[in-house]
């Protein structure tokens, strides 16, 4: 085994269908369900996930103001928290503090129990909202993981490990890609283009989300319209249209119109459309406190909403991004991952993350929906998403931001 080993961390988020949970896990959840509902452990870590999400977003936004952004803070945070189980010393502290946890105010056990509850909640079968997540380790067939690490990642993060022949990089690449393709039901293929020769361990984390609008758009109302990427660039996009009652709020602090659109189930998409020329102001000013207040403001108004069909993805090597958040030691020669294995010193070389967002008109009409007549439709004000905007997809049971993004150009893949 080489003395210095590169560790590949692959994080995925995409649309998929929810798979059934294991019987053992279901039985465990049933026994603890009452306690979880009264005081969910995931609620204690939710504010920290939200702070981490906005910190990560700002770093990505500073890197480029001309490209779409889309990532899953829950996916990234759960993978890093799981990895922290095998770290020690400053390496350990940096990861958890980089995720916005103060170890003098919250016990580490509470952090991991929060993620355990979060993952259990997200993976509960739901006939309305299709949502699932998971973690798996691919390890060099000659590398022995410590029993304590394996036990912890299994019990807290529902993760397992697959022996992998990393000496044959092509074989290992195909094994990982095959797992990802099967797990995403073909949504993501050939994710890993190549593996470094010294890679001996890879963590694949995924979160899949597919929601149907509580109040859908009508496919018959879709038409091509302009989307203004910037002052000099305009693209044509399929623009969806619906008139109805929406939770809409103008936030003076953010200089933005805020639209909330519910999914069937327990998730809401929050769209923030800044005034012209105010995107930078929105990005600098938005906070977890403001988002919390916006989520509570559910007063509805009549609006004609125009919204582009969106199919975007974000692919990132987050090493530099995480380093800017203070997570540096795990990428260095002095990284301490001795809680993972004692066979050889490990170093994280890459943190790869891919997230995919598809938004279209699909949905199922909810009972008791409001229908407006032609006269009311003409009187309703217009809210048109025809310029860059932000999106946060929020899951209510866990109070967590599943996805965060910025749509700069809906035609940009």
UniProtKB/Swiss-Prot annotation:
<dbReference type="InterPro" id="IPR023795">
    <property type="entry name" value="Serpin_CS"/>
</dbReference>
<feature type="site" description="Reactive bond">
    <location>
        <begin position="377"/>
        <end position="378"/>
    </location>
</feature>
<keyword id="KW-0909">Hibernation</keyword>
<feature type="signal peptide">
    <location>
        <begin position="1"/>
        <end position="24"/>
    </location>
</feature>
<protein>
    <recommendedName>
        <fullName>Hibernation-specific plasma protein HP-55</fullName>
    </recommendedName>
</protein>
<dbReference type="InterPro" id="IPR023796">
    <property type="entry name" value="Serpin_dom"/>
</dbReference>
<keyword id="KW-0873">Pyrrolidone carboxylic acid</keyword>
<dbReference type="GO" id="GO:0042750">
    <property type="term" value="P:hibernation"/>
</dbReference>
<comment type="similarity">
    <text>Belongs to the serpin family.</text>
</comment>
<feature type="glycosylation site" description="N-linked (GlcNAc...) asparagine">
    <location>
        <position position="102"/>
    </location>
</feature>
<dbReference type="Pfam" id="PF00079">
    <property type="entry name" value="Serpin"/>
</dbReference>
<dbReference type="InterPro" id="IPR000215">
    <property type="entry name" value="Serpin_fam"/>
</dbReference>
<feature type="modified residue" description="Pyrrolidone carboxylic acid">
    <location>
        <position position="25"/>
    </location>
</feature>
<keyword id="KW-0964">Secreted</keyword>
<feature type="glycosylation site" description="N-linked (GlcNAc...) asparagine">
    <location>
        <position position="165"/>
    </location>
</feature>
<dbReference type="GO" id="GO:0005615">
    <property type="term" value="C:extracellular space"/>
</dbReference>
<comment type="subunit">
    <text>Plasma proteins HP-20, HP-25, HP-27 and HP-55 form a 140 kDa complex via disulfide bonds in the plasma.</text>
</comment>
<feature type="glycosylation site" description="N-linked (GlcNAc...) asparagine">
    <location>
        <position position="65"/>
    </location>
</feature>
<keyword id="KW-0732">Signal</keyword>
<feature type="glycosylation site" description="N-linked (GlcNAc...) asparagine">
    <location>
        <position position="266"/>
    </location>
</feature>
<keyword id="KW-0646">Protease inhibitor</keyword>
<dbReference type="InterPro" id="IPR042178">
    <property type="entry name" value="Serpin_sf_1"/>
</dbReference>
<keyword id="KW-0722">Serine protease inhibitor</keyword>
<feature type="region of interest" description="RCL">
    <location>
        <begin position="368"/>
        <end position="387"/>
    </location>
</feature>
<dbReference type="InterPro" id="IPR042185">
    <property type="entry name" value="Serpin_sf_2"/>
</dbReference>
<dbReference type="GO" id="GO:0004867">
    <property type="term" value="F:serine-type endopeptidase inhibitor activity"/>
</dbReference>
<keyword id="KW-0325">Glycoprotein</keyword>
<keyword id="KW-1015">Disulfide bond</keyword>
<comment type="function">
    <text>Protease inhibitor.</text>
</comment>
<dbReference type="InterPro" id="IPR036186">
    <property type="entry name" value="Serpin_sf"/>
</dbReference>
